[in-house]
């Protein structure tokens, strides 16, 4: 019996274990950290052996294949040992893809992934399609394939997931943008990171579709190095040669495979970056053949995504916005660009090799104060203090919200859009956003 060992006992690892067992493999799950109770129960219910707080070498190194959770870097000592002995290492998505014939709509990019993925899922669901949501959001693809299979899956893919995918194929691949992010995981080399994103094209044929942002210079450069076999569907802000999704005279326009228009003002998502997300999602729906009235309705009633430019409430006529999902400079830039009132910006967390220079002119133009929130804020002081804005240094969310409350004047906006990962002070970016919302609502 072939032995599969799964490194990481979270959503993706536990789901992969259930599918592997269903397909007749000898399965073992190992996690260096603690495994959460719901995942322990899932593994126990299926009589799958697991360990936490350690990696037992003799139980791992004898695997025929390893399924690695995306959060584990290739530099991890156990992963290095496995690579040295030549054991194949794949992702949960790669594994799940072997056991389903469902149509896969896959979304990647540095920013906008979750919003675009959620919007496509919303459109497909509204159209009555049998669809699952998976990857970085939703439930484990492997668990859905094992226990509640669907005809379509809408999958958000990070570069980490794409790294360990080899035979998997997207029927519809979407590449939103490529800007520096996670460089700490790619030897601080932007080329390596960009290359990982382009893996979304692998194994595609003429029968498949590739949707991408035509105005992104990095995508344009990368595409020159890659043979694209799929039908291409570029989108851009304005109508230009070859572009099939754009805005023309304030009309949101899809030109292929069928023509569709609606007023831009009816789109539920606002801001320039969300326009691109809406174009990508509309093209995916159009390719699948969803009726235009459903596309229109879904684009106009989509409620948005938690922790992404989420309006919390107004206190003393100051609007508080939770954009905790902005874990890189580009995401923060887009958030700031969409602000229409003087803004107090909350920055900070675990730095991922950020270059803050592109942000400086916009911060100077839009911001009336800065609040730094992190275990170590020195790099923020070094980059932003010279702008001459009022600055407050905080090391907890309660101190941060208190500082914002004291600084903000009626008519202004407080924006949590930190540019950084959350792991220095919080469990994750959701925890950061939830703490912010709770404290703001208690002001």
Language model regions located:
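Phosphate-binding loop of NTP-binding sites
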Residues: 2, 21-22, 58-61, 70-214, ...
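C-terminal helical cap/extension that packs against the catalytic core
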Residues: 39-44, 357-412
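Short internal beta-strands
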Residues: 26-32, 210-214, 346-347, 366-375
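Beta-strand->loop->alpha-helix junctions that form or flank phosphate-binding loops
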Residues: 51-54, 90-94, 227-246, 298-300, ...
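Residues in the short beta-alpha loop(s) of Rossmann-like NAD(P)-binding domains
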Residues: 10, 33-35, 137, 215-216, ...
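Nucleotide phosphate-binding/pyrophosphate-handling subdomain across enzymes
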Residues: 3, 15-23, 262-367
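N-terminal leader/targeting and accessory segments in enzymes
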Residues: 1-91, 95, 270, 382, ...
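Residue-level signal for inorganic ion chemistry
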Residues: 20, 66, 107, 136, ...
